[in-house]
């Protein structure tokens, strides 16, 4: 069935006390990921890699297993999987290495739709190297990123293009394959921030064609960690910053220190949960809840949905405002009814002003997750009607 009614039972942290719409910042953890992390810590295998004894061999096997699973989830193959504490830290490591080959006259294309983890690292790189960052502008009416807004900035001087797979603010999904093709036509490389795309969409890195794809397992029911796929030949050719004993090839070049083995076990379990449940089923389930939410918001006087007004080509995430109330006040009022939403810019710093929002106050954000039910949606809408009526 597409409805996935029983899927909620897989999440010990989802008790029904709260209606949870805070998933875009981090979801609750699926039982298999909780169990896998705990089992690893109880196993006696909490050692290190590249040793001759059983626990060390188990660490190596875990890396191979989770890399294979992630390759299947992302459609990328097992090679080039870099594991780190977060996507932000992975991006800082990546851009620091990239910067060793850039200088004045080189250009990087970023977008105003992106999370700041795919903007600030490039701005810092440009500051340090003399390269130039060019910003592709989102459409302020639709909240979408037109392909030509990016491709018009790509030229002979372009070295890297950084683009989101899906907006973490309003959910819109750019055509990353078209952007990648345009970048590759001039010899540029492409980083796709897939953090918000991965939990809500079938990912196919091979079809996108990008050179780097980032994601974070805590956005898709796993532990707090970041996963970054780097095209293996590119990874081996980069002049990375690393300690001397670190390997000269493979993902270990960009992994700083010993990974969290329990996190790797949890990542593998969470990714398997997505694969076994089926991303097509998850997408269909979330789409029904998202349509219910969007339709309901359109029917509440004094509530304005930010950006796109339909569900086409987007992840099930939206932002809204309530007349006469700052976003933080709306979030606080909803919390008294045990409805969890976020307020602010949500790290989509560059998107706020084009969307007509205050740069800091932003708007209220609500996102659908696999465990969201119709009852959750109705709780949010009922509570919001009261807030809007008394605002």
Task: Label each residue range with its predicted role.
Residues 1-391:
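Pyridoxal 5′-phosphate
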């Amino acid at each position: 069935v597409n409805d996935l009614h029983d899927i909620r039972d897989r999440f010990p942290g989802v008790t029904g006390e709260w209606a949870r719409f805070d998933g875009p910042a981090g979801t609750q953890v699926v039982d298999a990921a909780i169990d896998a992390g705990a089992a690893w810590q109880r196993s006696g295998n909490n050692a290190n890699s590249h040793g001759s004894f059983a626990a060390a061999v188990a660490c190596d096997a875990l890396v191979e297993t989770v890399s294979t699973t992630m390759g299947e989830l992302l459609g990328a193959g097992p090679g080039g999987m870099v594991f780190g504490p977060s996507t932000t830290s992975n991006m800082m490591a990546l851009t620091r290495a990239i910067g060793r080959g850039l200088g004045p006259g080189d250009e990087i294309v970023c977008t105003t739709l992106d999370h700041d983890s795919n903007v600030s690292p490039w701005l810092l790189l440009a500051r340090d190297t003399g390269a130039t960052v060019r910003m592709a502008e989102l459409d302020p009416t639709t909240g979408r990123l037109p392909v030509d807004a990016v491709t018009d900035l790509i030229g002979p001087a372009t070295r890297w293009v950084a683009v989101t797979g899906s907006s973490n603010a309003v959910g819109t999904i750019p055509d990353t394959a078209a952007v990648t093709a345009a970048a590759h036509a001039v010899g540029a490389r492409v980083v796709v921030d897939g953090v918000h795309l991965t939990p809500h969409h079938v990912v196919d890195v091979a079809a996108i064609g990008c050179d780097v794809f980032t994601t974070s397992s805590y956005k898709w029911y796993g532990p707090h960690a970041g996963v970054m796929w780097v095209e293996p030949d590119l990874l081996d050719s980069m002049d990375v910053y690393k300690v001397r004993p670190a390997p000269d090839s493979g993902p270990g070049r960009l992994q700083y220190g010993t990974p969290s083995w329990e996190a790797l076990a949890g990542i593998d379990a969470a990714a398997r949960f997505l694969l076994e449940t089926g991303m097509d089923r998850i997408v269909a389930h979330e789409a029904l809840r998202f349509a219910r939410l969007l339709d309901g918001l359109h029917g509440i006087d004094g509530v304005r949905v930010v950006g796109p007004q339909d569900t086409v080509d987007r992840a099930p995430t939206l932002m809204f405002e309530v007349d006469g109330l700052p976003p933080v006040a709306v979030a606080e009022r909803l919390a008294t009814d045990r409805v969890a939403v976020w307020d602010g810019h949500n790290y989509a710093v560059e998107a706020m002003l084009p969307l007509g929002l205050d740069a800091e106050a932003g708007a209220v954000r609500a996102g659908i997750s696999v465990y969201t039910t119709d009852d959750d949606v109705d709780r949010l809408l009922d509570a919001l009607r009261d807030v809007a009526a008394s605002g």
